[in-house]
From Swiss-Prot:
Annotated source species: Nocardioides sp. (strain ATCC BAA-499 / JS614)
Keywords in alphabetical order: Isoprene biosynthesis, Lyase, Metal-binding
Listed cofactors: a divalent metal cation
Protein name per its UniProtKB record: 2-C-methyl-D-erythritol 2,4-cyclodiphosphate synthase
Lineage of producing organism: Bacteria, Bacillati, Actinomycetota, Actinomycetes, Propionibacteriales
Entry's Gene Ontology BP terms: isopentenyl diphosphate biosynthetic process, methylerythritol 4-phosphate pathway; terpenoid biosynthetic process
């Protein structure tokens, strides 16, 4: 196995709906009037991080690992998916360097809870996770407030097993 670091990218987007609690970046947002619709808790930040980690390790993507046809993951938290993703990446022979996640949406405003989100996601991954946020200036589904998206990158390095 090549010992050079590998980078992966992941994205996720979910629609905002009434009557669903909002889970985003490993946190519950009890004051938000809408939540994200999905098979699991629809935490787009955690899901994008999972996709980035799977991509970097060459292990497929979120859907091929935790598909909607598998009832075991119905309602699962983003943190649980991220913990299992990190376990699978490490089991495949990789160390996780870091993950960077950018959330795109009008709500919630992440600034006041950024450190808390980074702590929650880092704990799930077992490696540093940074979180940033932006809006889409009124453009597209995130700009119109119809949903929230996230983009993530991950750095993994193959573990060296003995000398050549």
């Amino acid at each position: 196995m090549d010992l050079l670091p590998r980078v992966g990218i992941g994205t996720d987007v979910h629609r905002l709906v009434d009557g669903v609690p909002l889970h985003l970046a490993g946190l519950h947002w009890p004051d938000e009037p809408q939540g994200l619709e999905g098979h699991s808790d629809a935490d787009v930040a955690a899901h994008a991080a999972c996709d980035a980690l799977f991509s970097a390790a060459g292990l497929g993507d979120l859907g091929s690992n935790f598909g909607t046809a598998d009832p075991a993951w119905a309602g699962a938290s983003g943190a649980a998916l991220l913990e299992e993703t990190a376990r699978r990446v490490r089991a495949a022979g990789f160390e996780i360097g870091n993950v960077a996640v950018q959330v795109i949406g009008n709500r919630p405003r992440l600034g006041g809870r950024r450190a808390e989100a980074e702590t929650a996601l880092s704990a799930a991954v077992g490696a540093p996770v940074s979180v940033s946020a932006t809006t889409a200036d009124g453009l597209g589904l995130t700009g119109r407030g119809e949903g929230v998206a996230a983009i993530a990158t991950a750095l993994v390095t193959p573990r060296h097993h003995g000398s050549a």
